[in-house]
């Protein structure tokens, strides 16, 4: 599940006992009690058992992880570009525009 789509997994209860990352605004996470903040990790991509979640900008890393999970041999060089390994937490926290009042 990539970008904001983990919200659907949360609504279905799938994330209740799994760690995950998601491209969701902090305000959205606060608004919806079904999103288990305690399981949210600040990583661009995260794998917990058979579930892979990623932020939208980590689509390359997500594709490589999914390919490997289904048994396709895939090197880190399979796709062009640079993989950034270390992110600061503040780089992975998103807020809505303050001019937008209603979620």
Where are each of the predicted segments found?
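Active-site-adjacent pocket-lining segments in enzyme domains
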Residues: 4-103
């Amino acid at each position: 599940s990539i970008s904001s789509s983990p919200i659907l997994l949360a609504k279905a209860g799938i994330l209740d006992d799994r760690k995950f990352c998601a491209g969701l605004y902090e305000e959205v996470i606060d608004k919806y009690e079904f999103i288990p903040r305690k399981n949210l990790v600040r990583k661009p991509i995260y794998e917990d058992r058979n579930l892979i979640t990623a932020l939208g900008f980590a689509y390359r890393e997500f594709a490589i992880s999914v390919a490997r999970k289904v048994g396709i041999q895939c090197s880190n060089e399979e796709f062009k570009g640079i993989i950034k390994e270390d992110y600061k937490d503040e780089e992975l926290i998103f807020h809505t525009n303050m001019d937008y009042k209603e979620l």
